[in-house]
A protein has these predicted regions:
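Glycine-rich beta-alpha loop segments
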Residues: 6-8, 17-120
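Alpha-helical scaffold segments in soluble metabolic enzymes
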Residues: 30, 73, 77, 105, ...
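Glycine/serine-rich loop-strand microenvironments at binding/catalytic pocket rims
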Residues: 35-54, 143-161, 176-180
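Short coil/turn connectors at secondary-structure junctions
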Residues: 46-48, 89-91, 113-116, 135-136, ...
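Phosphate/pyrophosphate-binding betaalpha-module
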Residues: 96-162, 166-169, 173, 198
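Short, solvent-exposed amphipathic alpha-helical segments in soluble enzyme
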Residues: 111-112, 174-179, 206-209, 238-239
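Arginine/glycine-rich "motif VI" loop of SF2 helicases in the C-terminal RecA-like domain
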Residues: 179-187, 212-216
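C-terminal functional extensions of proteins
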Residues: 192-259
Length: 259
Protein backbone atom coordinates (compact mmCIF):
# COMPACT_ATOMS: atom_id res chain seq x y z
CA UNK A 1 0.00 0.00 0.00
CA UNK A 2 1.40 3.43 -0.91
CA UNK A 3 2.01 5.74 2.02
CA UNK A 4 -0.37 8.68 2.29
CA UNK A 5 1.28 12.05 2.81
CA UNK A 6 -0.20 14.32 5.44
CA UNK A 7 -2.28 16.97 3.74
CA UNK A 8 -1.50 20.60 4.51
CA UNK A 9 -3.45 23.46 3.00
CA UNK A 10 -1.18 25.95 1.25
CA UNK A 11 -0.67 29.19 3.13
CA UNK A 12 -2.04 32.47 1.86
CA UNK A 13 0.85 34.43 0.40
CA UNK A 14 0.10 37.59 2.39
CA UNK A 15 0.25 35.55 5.63
CA UNK A 16 3.52 33.82 4.80
CA UNK A 17 5.96 35.67 7.06
CA UNK A 18 9.00 33.84 5.70
CA UNK A 19 8.12 35.00 2.20
CA UNK A 20 7.22 38.54 3.27
CA UNK A 21 10.60 38.90 4.99
CA UNK A 22 12.49 37.56 1.97
CA UNK A 23 14.41 39.49 -0.67
CA UNK A 24 11.79 38.47 -3.24
CA UNK A 25 9.08 40.35 -1.34
CA UNK A 26 11.03 43.60 -0.96
CA UNK A 27 8.72 45.43 -3.43
CA UNK A 28 5.73 44.48 -1.25
CA UNK A 29 7.40 45.85 1.87
CA UNK A 30 8.23 49.09 0.08
CA UNK A 31 4.65 49.40 -1.16
CA UNK A 32 3.33 48.76 2.35
CA UNK A 33 5.40 51.67 3.68
CA UNK A 34 3.72 53.86 1.08
CA UNK A 35 0.14 52.62 1.51
CA UNK A 36 -0.07 52.33 5.30
CA UNK A 37 0.65 56.02 6.04
CA UNK A 38 -1.47 57.14 3.09
CA UNK A 39 -4.43 55.13 4.38
CA UNK A 40 -4.00 56.49 7.90
CA UNK A 41 -3.76 60.08 6.65
CA UNK A 42 -6.92 59.65 4.60
CA UNK A 43 -8.77 58.10 7.54
CA UNK A 44 -7.65 60.82 9.96
CA UNK A 45 -7.91 63.68 7.46
CA UNK A 46 -4.32 64.74 7.70
CA UNK A 47 -3.61 67.28 4.99
CA UNK A 48 -0.46 69.30 5.62
CA UNK A 49 2.51 69.04 7.93
CA UNK A 50 5.24 71.19 9.41
CA UNK A 51 8.23 68.91 9.84
CA UNK A 52 10.86 69.16 12.56
CA UNK A 53 14.30 67.70 11.86
CA UNK A 54 17.04 67.47 14.48
CA UNK A 55 19.47 65.34 16.42
CA UNK A 56 18.55 62.17 18.31
CA UNK A 57 21.69 62.66 20.43
CA UNK A 58 21.15 66.14 21.79
CA UNK A 59 20.71 66.06 25.57
CA UNK A 60 18.45 68.50 27.36
CA UNK A 61 21.17 69.00 30.00
CA UNK A 62 24.01 69.23 27.46
CA UNK A 63 25.73 72.23 25.83
CA UNK A 64 23.04 72.47 23.15
CA UNK A 65 20.22 71.61 25.52
CA UNK A 66 18.37 74.87 24.93
CA UNK A 67 17.37 73.58 21.51
CA UNK A 68 15.19 70.91 23.13
CA UNK A 69 13.23 73.54 25.04
CA UNK A 70 12.99 75.81 22.00
CA UNK A 71 11.85 73.01 19.70
CA UNK A 72 9.15 72.12 22.21
CA UNK A 73 8.09 75.76 22.51
CA UNK A 74 8.01 76.27 18.75
CA UNK A 75 5.95 73.12 18.20
CA UNK A 76 3.49 74.35 20.83
CA UNK A 77 3.23 77.76 19.15
CA UNK A 78 2.80 76.21 15.70
CA UNK A 79 0.06 73.92 16.96
CA UNK A 80 -1.79 76.68 18.79
CA UNK A 81 -1.70 78.79 15.63
CA UNK A 82 -2.86 75.85 13.53
CA UNK A 83 -5.76 75.09 15.86
CA UNK A 84 -6.85 78.73 15.65
CA UNK A 85 -7.37 78.46 11.88
CA UNK A 86 -11.15 78.20 11.33
CA UNK A 87 -11.07 75.61 8.57
CA UNK A 88 -9.72 72.18 9.62
CA UNK A 89 -8.59 71.66 6.03
CA UNK A 90 -6.13 74.55 6.39
CA UNK A 91 -4.47 73.29 9.56
CA UNK A 92 -0.95 71.98 9.91
CA UNK A 93 0.20 69.03 11.99
CA UNK A 94 3.63 68.90 13.56
CA UNK A 95 5.58 65.92 12.23
CA UNK A 96 8.90 64.54 13.46
CA UNK A 97 11.06 61.47 13.11
CA UNK A 98 9.26 60.03 16.11
CA UNK A 99 12.34 59.38 18.23
CA UNK A 100 13.98 61.15 21.14
CA UNK A 101 15.69 64.48 21.70
CA UNK A 102 14.61 67.15 19.16
CA UNK A 103 12.05 64.77 17.67
CA UNK A 104 10.52 64.16 21.07
CA UNK A 105 10.53 67.87 21.82
CA UNK A 106 8.52 68.58 18.66
CA UNK A 107 5.88 65.96 19.38
CA UNK A 108 5.78 66.97 23.03
CA UNK A 109 5.21 70.63 22.22
CA UNK A 110 2.35 69.80 19.87
CA UNK A 111 0.81 67.58 22.55
CA UNK A 112 1.20 70.40 25.09
CA UNK A 113 -1.06 72.50 22.87
CA UNK A 114 -3.65 69.75 22.58
CA UNK A 115 -2.96 69.02 18.93
CA UNK A 116 -2.43 65.84 16.98
CA UNK A 117 1.14 65.09 16.01
CA UNK A 118 2.90 62.62 13.71
CA UNK A 119 5.96 60.44 14.28
CA UNK A 120 7.78 58.73 11.41
CA UNK A 121 10.04 56.34 13.28
CA UNK A 122 12.82 54.27 11.72
CA UNK A 123 14.06 50.89 12.87
CA UNK A 124 17.71 51.20 13.94
CA UNK A 125 19.98 49.04 16.11
CA UNK A 126 20.49 51.96 18.49
CA UNK A 127 19.24 55.46 19.38
CA UNK A 128 15.84 55.42 17.73
CA UNK A 129 12.93 54.49 19.98
CA UNK A 130 9.41 55.91 19.59
CA UNK A 131 8.63 58.75 21.96
CA UNK A 132 5.37 58.73 23.95
CA UNK A 133 4.01 62.04 22.63
CA UNK A 134 3.02 60.89 19.13
CA UNK A 135 -0.75 60.73 18.61
CA UNK A 136 -2.05 57.13 18.58
CA UNK A 137 -2.70 56.10 15.01
CA UNK A 138 -0.24 58.67 13.65
CA UNK A 139 2.96 56.86 14.60
CA UNK A 140 4.62 54.80 11.87
CA UNK A 141 7.58 52.44 11.89
CA UNK A 142 9.71 52.42 8.74
CA UNK A 143 12.40 50.03 7.60
CA UNK A 144 13.42 52.00 4.50
CA UNK A 145 14.95 55.43 4.92
CA UNK A 146 13.82 56.52 1.46
CA UNK A 147 10.17 55.75 2.18
CA UNK A 148 10.39 57.65 5.45
CA UNK A 149 11.89 60.65 3.63
CA UNK A 150 9.15 60.47 1.02
CA UNK A 151 6.56 60.96 3.77
CA UNK A 152 8.57 63.76 5.32
CA UNK A 153 8.54 65.60 2.00
CA UNK A 154 5.20 65.05 0.37
CA UNK A 155 2.84 66.53 2.94
CA UNK A 156 5.28 69.17 4.15
CA UNK A 157 4.48 72.84 3.85
CA UNK A 158 7.57 73.72 5.87
CA UNK A 159 10.54 72.03 7.48
CA UNK A 160 12.44 73.31 10.50
CA UNK A 161 15.96 71.91 10.82
CA UNK A 162 17.40 72.08 14.32
CA UNK A 163 21.04 71.16 14.98
CA UNK A 164 21.77 67.57 14.05
CA UNK A 165 24.22 65.17 12.47
CA UNK A 166 24.30 62.94 9.41
CA UNK A 167 20.62 62.01 9.59
CA UNK A 168 19.48 65.61 9.91
CA UNK A 169 21.80 66.69 7.10
CA UNK A 170 20.50 63.89 4.89
CA UNK A 171 16.90 64.93 5.50
CA UNK A 172 17.64 68.62 5.04
CA UNK A 173 19.51 68.18 1.77
CA UNK A 174 16.80 65.88 0.42
CA UNK A 175 14.31 68.73 0.86
CA UNK A 176 16.70 71.36 -0.52
CA UNK A 177 17.34 69.19 -3.59
CA UNK A 178 13.61 68.78 -4.21
CA UNK A 179 13.14 72.54 -3.88
CA UNK A 180 16.13 73.44 -6.05
CA UNK A 181 15.19 71.04 -8.84
CA UNK A 182 11.49 71.91 -8.61
CA UNK A 183 10.56 68.24 -8.40
CA UNK A 184 7.57 69.19 -6.26
CA UNK A 185 4.78 71.33 -7.63
CA UNK A 186 4.67 73.68 -4.63
CA UNK A 187 7.35 75.25 -2.45
CA UNK A 188 8.44 74.08 0.98
CA UNK A 189 9.52 76.71 3.49
CA UNK A 190 12.96 75.82 4.89
CA UNK A 191 13.94 77.21 8.29
CA UNK A 192 17.40 76.56 9.72
CA UNK A 193 17.09 76.95 13.47
CA UNK A 194 20.33 78.06 15.14
CA UNK A 195 22.17 80.45 12.83
CA UNK A 196 25.61 80.03 14.40
CA UNK A 197 25.38 76.24 14.27
CA UNK A 198 24.31 76.04 10.65
CA UNK A 199 26.76 78.66 9.40
CA UNK A 200 29.57 76.71 11.05
CA UNK A 201 28.47 73.27 9.86
CA UNK A 202 27.60 74.10 6.24
CA UNK A 203 29.30 76.84 4.24
CA UNK A 204 26.45 77.55 1.86
CA UNK A 205 28.04 80.74 0.39
CA UNK A 206 31.13 78.72 -0.53
CA UNK A 207 28.98 76.40 -2.62
CA UNK A 208 27.78 79.43 -4.56
CA UNK A 209 31.29 80.90 -4.94
CA UNK A 210 32.52 77.64 -6.41
CA UNK A 211 29.60 77.52 -8.83
CA UNK A 212 28.01 74.45 -7.24
CA UNK A 213 24.71 76.22 -6.56
CA UNK A 214 23.14 79.39 -7.94
CA UNK A 215 22.77 82.58 -5.95
CA UNK A 216 19.01 82.14 -6.00
CA UNK A 217 19.43 78.79 -4.24
CA UNK A 218 20.61 80.65 -1.15
CA UNK A 219 17.15 82.18 -1.08
CA UNK A 220 15.76 78.78 -0.09
CA UNK A 221 17.41 79.17 3.33
CA UNK A 222 15.82 81.08 6.20
CA UNK A 223 17.89 81.33 9.39
CA UNK A 224 16.01 81.76 12.67
CA UNK A 225 17.06 81.80 16.32
CA UNK A 226 13.91 82.04 18.42
CA UNK A 227 10.54 80.28 18.44
CA UNK A 228 8.81 83.64 17.96
CA UNK A 229 10.88 84.48 14.88
CA UNK A 230 10.29 81.04 13.40
CA UNK A 231 6.54 81.30 13.94
CA UNK A 232 6.49 84.75 12.33
CA UNK A 233 8.24 83.36 9.24
CA UNK A 234 5.85 80.43 9.04
CA UNK A 235 2.74 82.56 9.40
CA UNK A 236 3.97 84.98 6.75
CA UNK A 237 4.69 82.16 4.30
CA UNK A 238 1.76 79.85 5.02
CA UNK A 239 -1.00 82.14 6.22
CA UNK A 240 -2.60 82.25 2.78
CA UNK A 241 -2.44 78.50 2.08
CA UNK A 242 -5.59 77.30 0.34
CA UNK A 243 -7.74 74.57 1.85
CA UNK A 244 -7.39 70.98 0.76
CA UNK A 245 -9.83 68.13 1.20
CA UNK A 246 -7.46 65.17 0.89
CA UNK A 247 -3.85 64.44 1.78
CA UNK A 248 -2.08 66.94 -0.44
CA UNK A 249 0.49 64.54 -1.80
CA UNK A 250 2.67 66.80 -3.92
CA UNK A 251 2.78 65.90 -7.58
CA UNK A 252 6.31 65.48 -8.86
CA UNK A 253 7.06 67.62 -11.89
CA UNK A 254 7.89 65.77 -15.08
CA UNK A 255 10.47 67.20 -17.45
CA UNK A 256 7.66 68.49 -19.64
CA UNK A 257 5.63 70.13 -16.87
CA UNK A 258 8.71 71.84 -15.42
CA UNK A 259 9.40 73.68 -18.66
Amino acid sequence: MPRTMAHTDPQLAYKDEAFLDSAAARPLRILAEYLQPLHAYEQQRVHDTIVFFGSARLRADGPLGRYYDEARELARLVTEWSLSIPSPACRFLVCSGGGGSIMEAANRGAADAGGRTIGLNIGLPHEQRPNPYVTPGLGFQFHYFFMRKLWFAHLARAIIAFPGGFGTLDELFEILTLCQTRKLDRPIVVLLYGTSYWREIVNFPALMRHGMIAEEDLGLLNFVDTPADALTRLRAALGSESATTAPSFARSRTCESAQ
